[in-house]
Amino acid sequence: MSRYVEKVRETKETKVQVKLELDGEGKVEIRTPVPFFDHMLHSMLFYMKVNATILGEDKQGYDDHHIVEDVGITLGQAIKDALGDRRGIKRFSSAVIPMDEALVLVAVDVSGRGYASTNLDLKREKIGDLSTENVAHFFWSLATNAGITLHVRKLDGVNEHHIVEAAFKGVGLALGEACSIQGEGIRSTKGSL
């Protein structure tokens, strides 16, 4: 079963192209107009162990909100499509990621039900060119469109770059493991996801 998909989302504000192979080796190419976001996406997808290309164009140039949101939507839809009926996936996973003084907990359920709760206690307005409010918004857009339940929590840390990077790495690690094939059946007492 191929778990490869290509998705394109084009609006008056953005154009986002995603190529995603869930059973990859972490070969990633990211190009959006928000370099710090590119760095975070690259970390997430590398630790997810997928092969991915994400190309994002911001047609309006107002701020980073639209491109971050639309990448989350498109990548989430690509993950959902690549998972198919979710037969054989591990489904649940979690990760606790240290990055120097920062420590972040991530928990994932690839259930078909989209939800995200993010609490990183970020105080700065921006990290590089990424508005910190868009970190939680990206995770929400990703999770609701992928049909996953996602919880991201800061346990410790003061350096917000480290906190955000640990969060993206943790999401990648936990999501990659939860999407991995572990058997043949559907991991649900209901018999479907």
Swiss-Prot record:
Example GO biological process: L-histidine biosynthetic process
PROSITE patterns: IGP_DEHYDRATASE_1 (PS00954), IGP_DEHYDRATASE_2 (PS00955)
Reactions catalysed according to its record: D-erythro-1-(imidazol-4-yl)glycerol 3-phosphate = 3-(imidazol-4-yl)-2-oxopropyl phosphate + H2O
Protein's name in the database: Imidazoleglycerol-phosphate dehydratase
Swiss-Prot/TrEMBL keywords: Amino-acid biosynthesis, Cytoplasm, Histidine biosynthesis, Lyase
Keyword Magnesium set for record: no
Entry-linked InterPro entries: IGPD_sf (IPR038494), ImidazoleglycerolP_deHydtase (IPR000807), ImidazoleglycerP_deHydtase_CS (IPR020565), Ribosomal_Su5_D2-typ_SF (IPR020568)
Subcellular location: Cytoplasm
Cellular-component GO terms for this entry: cytoplasm
Pathway: Amino-acid biosynthesis; L-histidine biosynthesis; L-histidine from 5-phospho-alpha-D-ribose 1-diphosphate: step 6/9
One Pfam match: IGPD
CDD domains cross-referenced by the UniProt entry: IGPD
EC number(s) given by UniProt: 4.2.1.19
Organism lineage: Archaea, Thermoproteota, Thermoprotei, Sulfolobales, Sulfolobaceae
Keyword Protein transport part of the UniProt annotation: no
Disulfide bonds: none
Gene3D superfamilies in the record: Imidazole glycerol phosphate dehydratase, domain 1
One term of GO molecular function: imidazoleglycerol-phosphate dehydratase activity
The family this protein is said to belong to: Belongs to the imidazoleglycerol-phosphate dehydratase family.
